[in-house]
């Protein structure tokens, strides 16, 4: 067993078949969601290469209805497939991969904590949203934004300390972070808002999806450890 999960089939052969088919279905849905989100243009966010990608909903479903390890496998598969339509944006794919790993891990963690209470999915997704927002906002300030600016030649180094100094004394850069003159203030203003919007949307879709899957399989499924 790989922690708490939803188990369906009593026979080993049936369980393996379900793992393969359900994981393949979730990967297909995740690919569709990720592909479509790449072409949805949102003012200002699109200029900063920020997309609202909800593919993590299906990775989370795989983590609970199959296993955490299978969810990680299809997360990697999703990232590799993303190079087909977004091959030049390796930093964005790296960020999405980290975000997907994190949201899957946080939902698993909070499910362990709130598995026995009512409205558990609401608690799980709400806390996972807050945790992922804090993690990814901080990571953007430390790594992603400096790396992105360095890759495109905006700054001479990817060291976040030096990048922050350059940003603070260069008004031209303030456009990228909502016009906030302080680097970390701008990072938290932009990426906190972006991640809250993104993962709130993931939660709004994820809660009914998880409840629907659980209800559909309820007679065959039970939470096991």
Swiss-Prot record:
Membrane topology qualifier: Multi-pass membrane protein
Entry's localization field: Cell membrane
Matching NCBIfam families: memb_MPN527
Membrane-spanning ranges: 25-45, 57-77, 83-103, 109-129, 135-155, 187-207
Major location (coarse): membrane
Protein's name in the database: Uncharacterized protein MG350.1 homolog
Keyword Repeat set for record: no
One GO cellular component term noted in the UniProt record for this chain: plasma membrane
Protein keywords: Cell membrane, Membrane, Transmembrane, Transmembrane helix
Domain of life, per lineage: Bacteria
